[in-house]
């Protein structure tokens, strides 16, 4: 397990974006080899998405051969509704990059058979060869996607009734009117995320410090679903200083001492422009015995 600690939200977002960029480029995706990602919504990943858009616009990164699977979606909210996660992803990320619409997968909260939709989502992930990198965020109570406290740590994609705390927290997105807030959602399970070959969890802000403490310093507990990733062979937690306020001083000191090593994951920072130049130069080399 890696814990990456940066001073500010912007730095944590940039580190995460650099890591994603390097993972995609080093994977060397193509028509017969897609890089498959799991993606979150919410305010935490916005800075990371903005950096990834910047890399694409600068010609350093392409999403042409990337497939994405989103974590969750509200039940009963039209996909064109401004607060649907479909709208969130297209407005904040997908429409700004070169990803093909057919390669983006978001659960349909208006499907006639919701459980069948969840089962089909799991099958699409399997058909894509599994998820290479699942990026996630958490809530202050440590929930991942809509896997709230008490969720099974081996759960799969399913229909979930939302806790009142979640409904109250989400009311700010619906003019403060509880009657407008969806009470159910479709969500990937903790087990679905655990199946990914690598997991990266973004945690920023003092309001999530206790959840990070539970994830790093205490044991695995279904009341804090983020703690499950202690048992994943490749987990990267990326956080800012504010999120570490509940950690022991020696814990913070230990992981900060590893930053020289961990920064080698993003430095050098690769670019598809460099790869294209290398290919061009290789093609121009004269034949020799």
From Swiss-Prot:
Family matches, as InterPro entries: Glc/Gal-6P_isomerase, Glucosamine6P_isomerase, Glucosamine6P_isomerase_CS, NagB/RpiA_transferase-like
Lineage, highest ranks first: Eukaryota, Metazoa, Chordata, Craniata, Vertebrata
Reaction equation(s) it catalyzes: alpha-D-glucosamine 6-phosphate + H2O = beta-D-fructose 6-phosphate + NH4(+)
A UniProt-annotated Pfam family: Glucosamine_iso
This protein's name: Glucosamine-6-phosphate deaminase 1
Compartment(s): Cytoplasm
Family: Belongs to the glucosamine/galactosamine-6-phosphate isomerase family.
Protein EC: 3.5.99.6
């Amino acid at each position: 397990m890696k814990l990456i600690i940066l001073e500010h939200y912007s730095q944590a977002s940039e580190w995460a974006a650099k890591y994603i960029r390097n993972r995609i480029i080093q994977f060397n995706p193509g028509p017969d080899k897609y890089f498959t990602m799991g993606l979150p919504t919410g305010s935490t990943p916005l800075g990371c998405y903005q950096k990834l858009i910047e890399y694409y616009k600068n010609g350093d990164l392409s999403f042409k051969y990337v497939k994405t699977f989103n974590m969750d979606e509200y039940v009963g909210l039209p996909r064109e509704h401004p607060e649907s996660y479909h709208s969130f992803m297209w407005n904040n990320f997908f429409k700004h990059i070169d990803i093909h619409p057919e390669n983006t997968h978001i659960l349909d909260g208006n499907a006639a058979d919701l459980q069948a939709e969840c089962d089909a989502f799991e099958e699409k992930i399997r058909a894509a060869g599994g998820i290479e990198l699942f990026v996630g965020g958490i809530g202050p109570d440590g929930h991942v996607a809509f896997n709230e406290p008490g969720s099974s740590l081996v759960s799969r994609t399913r229909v979930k009734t939302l806790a009142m705390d979640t409904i109250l927290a989400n009311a700010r997105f619906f003019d403060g009117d509880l009657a407008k807030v969806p009470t159910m959602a479709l969500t990937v399970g903790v087990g679905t995320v655990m199946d990914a070959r690598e997991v990266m969890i973004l945690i920023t802000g003092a309001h999530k410090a206790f959840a990070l403490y539970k994830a790093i310093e205490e044991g695995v507990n279904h009341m804090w679903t983020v703690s499950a990733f202690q048992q994943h062979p490749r987990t990267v937690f990326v956080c800012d200083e504010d999120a570490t306020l509940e950690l022991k001083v020696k814990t913070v000191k230990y992981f900060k001492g590893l930053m020289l090593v961990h920064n080698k994951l993003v430095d050098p920072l690769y670019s598809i422009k460099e790869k294209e130049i290398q290919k061009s130069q290789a093609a121009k080399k004269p034949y020799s015995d």
